[in-house]
Amino acid sequence: MTASLKANDGSAELAALMTDLGRRARAAARVLALAPPEQKNRALEAMERAIRAGAAAILDANAEDVADAKGSGANSAFLDRLTLTPARVEAMAEGIAVVRGIADPVGAVTESWQRPNGMTIERVRVPLGVVAVIFESRPNVTADAGVLCLKSGNAVILRGGSESFRSGRAIHACLVQGLREAGLPEAAITLVPTRERAAVGLLLGGLNGTVDVIVPRGGKSLVARVESEARVPVFAHLEGINHVYVDRTADLDMAKSIVLNAKMRRTGVCGAAETLLIDRAAADTHLAPLVGMLIDAGCEVRGDDAVQRADARVKPATDQDWDTEYLDAVIAAKVVDDVDDAITHIHEHGSHHTDAIVAEDAKTAAKFLGEVDSAIVLHNASTQFADGGEFGFGAEIGIATGKFHARGPVGAEQLTTFKYRIHGTGQTRP
């Protein structure tokens, strides 16, 4: 028997509210698990229309959130993650369209075989149930998580950061409109309607067994708290201490293009490069141009002795720099002996998120891709492709850096599990 839910640091009213949210989400999950793909896609199509029609209201709400964040002294990287623009709202709508177009994972038979006794066994994809997503400053997570959970037949409880509270409500209203138009329960996508921090603790407790999995999207402290306190499984999205290794066989122009994009396209995303590793054999030709390019682009470079000698503007790196996710226009840079030394550095300082090699030699690239133990490894491509949309998933609920169940971008398919269906003709076990 499940113990009654209590708010250790919140009110009885909050505990009652969260209990009710969990109960309603569980009921909605049972409906969604049986909803036909056509009905879910009608909801997604209506959500796409609602996002476009509600763009002005979403942007107005976001402007208030951004103004409050600026007044609180938020840095530029935080503001970039929080800010919505007309282009970003349109990208949100386009992402919903892509999710609508992907194959419905629910009910897919991934494997089937017949036993000697004539029984047929099928492995079939089924929803997880109720997913709780706890996130911080990115308002677009409201849409991404909502539509991916819907597509995969899951109900979702969203707890956004207080900084993006207004933005999240405006986006959520569009998602609920889509559910309503398609005849699906509104509790299928639930937004926690309070900024009270105690709501997070209640979610981590599982809401009396109604939550099946928790996905944290945010900084290191949030993820650490979720992993420490959660009483249900967690898809951990850890910090992105991502590396770009420039090999001795790298084409310089390609390396410059990839490194600049990996670091500076958007510095506040989890796929941004945070450390540049350069092969010692390429230092004479590649080091100064790469470092100079970054500094000229407005990026602060913190380097070891060899990197400091390449450009007087480089600041000395400390031991802490190799373990830091800056999410800002700052990068650590180091000269390594070879690809083996680069792999060793990544194993010691990386976060198993995303790492890239720039190299023309296929054997060296294969070694890097095979030995670097990260969720995403790239050859001759920017780390900023660490994104569910770029994988063709339409969106992502996070980048899972663990090794159980989901790894890498978590899309609709990764939000399912499986069960076995067995068809017999009266067989009994001897």
Curated annotation (Swiss-Prot):
GO terms for cellular component: cytoplasm. Its EC number is 1.2.1.41. It is found in: Cytoplasm. InterPro entries: Ald_DH/histidinol_DH, Ald_DH_C, Ald_DH_N, Aldehyde_DH_dom, G-glutamylP_reductase_CS, Glu-5-SA_DH, GPR_dom. Gene3D superfamilies: Aldehyde Dehydrogenase, Chain A, domain 1, Aldehyde Dehydrogenase, Chain A, domain 2. Its main location: cytoplasm. Disulfide bonds: none annotated. PROSITE patterns: PROA. Signal peptide: none annotated. It is an enzyme of class 1 (oxidoreductase). GO terms for biological process: L-proline biosynthetic process. It catalyses: L-glutamate 5-semialdehyde + phosphate + NADP(+) = L-glutamyl 5-phosphate + NADPH + H(+). Keywords: Amino-acid biosynthesis, Cytoplasm, NADP, Oxidoreductase, Proline biosynthesis. SUPFAM superfamilies: ALDH-like. Pathway: Amino-acid biosynthesis; L-proline biosynthesis; L-glutamate 5-semialdehyde from L-glutamate: step 2/2. Belongs to the gamma-glutamyl phosphate reductase family. Catalyzes the NADPH-dependent reduction of L-glutamate 5-phosphate into L-glutamate 5-semialdehyde and phosphate. The product spontaneously undergoes cyclization to form 1-pyrroline-5-carboxylate. NCBIfam families: PRK00197.1, proA. This is Gamma-glutamyl phosphate reductase. It comes from Rhodopseudomonas palustris (strain BisB5).
